Every structure is written in structure tokens, then in C-alpha cells.
């Protein structure tokens, strides 16, 4: 008999680039990715984006979408609630990995709050209702994500990594949007097109991994042994020298997806 169909085990949203993810039971998929995913980004005053690669403490910031805005939490600091209605919306040129585009300023309270977290002056930018960032590569508008609208990893691939590594790794270290179950390890590497719920996805390319994966889950510390990159380098290195784990997806239509669906 046919093996069981893979399932969508979980969905994860990252409202602010580089901050903590939050689980969703269902999500609306748009051209730009999950609705509400990476719509905000922390930048230096000149618009240069900052991430947990240099500021690992960002991963302890929890951003929760609330009616008309965002609720921010960080250990040892008062919560901050942001309302889109209060945003200055002053345009600012920014960029992500060579793409230059305009985003909108949020508000001074957000800048001050996040500057305390970052330990240096920063600003919080918002994409607005639609992204001003068009990527030729994907043929779509993209959020503040590194390059593709969505990322998928299977539980089996993480289990395989954990069998090979001395450290135990969490899926949260890989900042994936979609987690698949019921597959063989790295089965997703061979997928070309998949359907989840109402949405068909193009499996665009494998995701190359960086130092950010080595921030230990739930902390602001990098792993001293550079895990999981050290282990992944031994068996997931491409011909280009990059280390690959997970698959980048592009949605071919808009629609709803739900955790637990095939």
C-alpha cells in the first residue's frame, strides 16, 4: 500500500525579522509569504538591517500580532504595544542582501524600546500594506525575509541531524515557516511542487544556512562548538561550499493552510 501522505505538522510566523517565532494553527498564504510574516525589520539609523547574526538577543524578543498592531515582549522590560494608526509612515530606504527598497518608519517608542534591546540606536521599519520589494528571482513581491517567501523543513531531517550531532537542536533554530511530518530525512530535497490545503507551492531551491542557526534555542548565546553548522557541514555541503538545510518555497496562488493537513 502507498506510504502515508506527508502532513503539515506546524506553521510558524515571524512578525519581526530575526525575533522569536510564534506557532499558528492556520495561516493565509499570499504572494509575499504567510500573512503577517516578517512585515517588520530592525535597522540602524541609516537603514542597514540588523539580525541575530550580530545581535542574538533579538531572538528573545516576542512579537505578537494584535488588533491593528503588534505587542512586543522582552525579558526584564515592560511590554510595548504598537498601533499601525500611530505609525509615522515616513519612508526610509533600506535593503536585504542587495535588494534596495523603501519601507516605512513605525514610531519613536518602538525605536527606543528596541534600542535598549540592541544596545545601540536602531529603528523599527514596517513594510506597509504591500511590499515595495520585488525579486526578479522569484517573480514575486517579498517581505523582509532573506530571499524567499517561505521555508519548509521536515521533522525527519531534524531528527537525522540530531542523530549525527552531539548537541540536541530545536526546529526554532532554523526559523522555518512550515514543518512537515511523515517523510524520510531530506525527502523534501526532491520535491518540485507540493500542495498544502488550498495552496500549491513551487519548491524553489534549497536554503543555505548561516551562523544564525547556532544561536541556542531560547537564549541569546551562540553555541561554542558552532553547532549545528559544524555537523551540517560534514554532510550537507553543496558544490558551492554552502551548507543546505530546508527548502525555499514560492506560493503559486493565495489560500489557507492548516496544521495537520496533508
What would you call each of these model-derived segments?
Residues 1-262:
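Metal-cofactor-dependent catalytic cores
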Amino acid at each position: 500500500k502507498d506510504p502515508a501522505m506527508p502532513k503539515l505538522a506546524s506553521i510558524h510566523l515571524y512578525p519581526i525579522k530575526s525575533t522569536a517565532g510564534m506557532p499558528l494553527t492556520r495561516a493565509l498564504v499570499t504572494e509575499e509569504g504567510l500573512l503577517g510574516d516578517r512585515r517588520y525589520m530592525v535597522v540602524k539609523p541609516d537603514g542597514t538591517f540588523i539580525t541575530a547574526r550580530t545581535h542574538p538577543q533579538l531572538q528573545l524578543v516576542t512579537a505578537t500580532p494584535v488588533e491593528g498592531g503588534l505587542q512586543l515582549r522582552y525579558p526584564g522590560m515592560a511590554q510595548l504595544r504598537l498601533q499601525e494608526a500611530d505609525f509615522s509612515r515616513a519612508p526610509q530606504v533600506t535593503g536585504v542582501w542587495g535588494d534596495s527598497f523603501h519601507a516605512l518608519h513605525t514610531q519613536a517608542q518602538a525605536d527606543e524600546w528596541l534600542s535598549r534591546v540592541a544596545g545601540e540606536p536602531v529603528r523599527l521599519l514596517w513594510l506597509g500594506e504591500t511590499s515595495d520589494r520585488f525579486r526578479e528571482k522569484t517573480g514575486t513581491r517579498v517581505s523582509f525575509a532573506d530571499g524567499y517567501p517561505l521555508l519548509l523543513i521536515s521533522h525527519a531531517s531534524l531528527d537525522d541531524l540530531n542523530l549525527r550531532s552531539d548537541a540536541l537542536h530545536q526546529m526554532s533554530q532554523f526559523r522555518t515557516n512550515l514543518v512537515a511530518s511523515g517523510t524520510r530525512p531530506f525527502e523534501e530535497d526532491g520535491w518540485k511542487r507540493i500542495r498544502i490545503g488550498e495552496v500549491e507551492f513551487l519548491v524553489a531551491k534549497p536554503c543555505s544556512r548561516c551562523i544564525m542557526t547556532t544561536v541556542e534555542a531560547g537564549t541569546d548565546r551562540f553555541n561554542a562548538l558552532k553547532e549545528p553548522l559544524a555537523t551540517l557541514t560534514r554532510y550537507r555541503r553543496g558544490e558551492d561550499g554552502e551548507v543546505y538545510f530546508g527548502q525555499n518555497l514560492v506560493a503559486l496562488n493565495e489560500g489557507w493552510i492548516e496544521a495537520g493537513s496533508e
